[in-house]
């Protein structure tokens, strides 16, 4: 996957974000995407080739690996990043639509008094208010939901966040209960706990930003004359 393209797209969203949102994007890029691309792939490598079972029965090793690791950690994290990043793109699409509408009205002469030219529309600072506030807030809410959902799926699918050194398997076509060994379990456990911890930090940042937006929205409402 081209993570550079994703970084470029989300980097454009960064200028519409709050200060907390900018911190979230920094954590996403440095502590998740960079770690996933640079380090995690080296740790996992060819997982199935390094999964060893004490049997020569054809197919037993493959079945046992599929039973304990139905989805690769790397692919699950990549899928998580895609889901978590997608709501932020809705904000960029909303801003692009707003500017397109303003350009259309400017060309028609409906708002010529508000802007000197089209370039001023492009460089106008975007404020998180009105319908954009709802889009931005909804995107944060769905980010929290996706983060929490993937953490739950990860915990259930792998029976916790630690990597076992030895797993026992009796699935067909294994002749009996066989012992299977996972390579570099401690190193993988460290990476897994790190990625889960960063997910937790991202959830905390998203919840904090959501509370900040709600408080600002409510305080703005209270200042309006009745």
UniProtKB/Swiss-Prot annotation:
Amino-acid biosynthesis as UniProt keyword: no
Q: Which residues lie within the membrane without crossing it?
A: 2-13
Q: Topological domains (Cytoplasmic): residue ranges?
A: 14-20, 95-135, 211-226
User: What highest taxon heads this organism's lineage?
Assistant: Eukaryota
Physiological role: Structural component of gap junctions. Gap junctions are dodecameric channels that connect the cytoplasm of adjoining cells. They are formed by the docking of two hexameric hemichannels, one from each cell membrane. Small molecules and ions diffuse from one cell to a neighboring cell via the central pore.
TM ranges? 21-40, 74-94, 136-156, 190-210
Q: What do we know about how this protein assembles, alone or with others?
A: A hemichannel or connexon is composed of a hexamer of connexins. A functional gap junction is formed by the apposition of two hemichannels. Forms heteromeric channels with GJB4. Interacts with CNST.
Q: Which residues form the signal peptide?
A: none
The record places the following residue ranges in the Extracellular compartment, namely 41-73, 157-189
Q: Give GO terms: molecular function aspect only.
A: calcium ion binding; gap junction channel activity; gap junction channel activity involved in cell communication by electrical coupling; identical protein binding
Give the bilayer topology.
Answer: Multi-pass membrane protein
Membership in a protein family: Belongs to the connexin family. Beta-type (group I) subfamily.
Q: Where does Ca(2+) bind?
A: 42, 45, 47
Any one Pfam family here would be Connexin
In the UniProt record, does the keyword tRNA processing occur?
no
**Got a GO cellular component term for this one?**
plasma membrane
Q: Which UniProt keywords apply?
A: Calcium, Cell junction, Cell membrane, Disulfide bond, Gap junction, Hearing, Membrane, Metal-binding, Transmembrane, Transmembrane helix
InterPro entries attached here?
Answer: Connexin, Connexin26, Connexin_CCC, Connexin_CS, Connexin_N, Connexin_N_sf
* Gene3D superfamilies attached to this UniProt entry: Gap junction channel protein cysteine-rich domain
Q: Which cysteines are joined by disulfide bonds?
A: 53-180, 60-174, 64-169
Localization recorded for this chain is: Cell membrane; Cell junction, Gap junction
> Please, one GO biological process term?
cell-cell signaling
Name by which UniProt lists this protein: Gap junction beta-2 protein
Q: Which SMART domains match?
A: CNX, Connexin_CCC
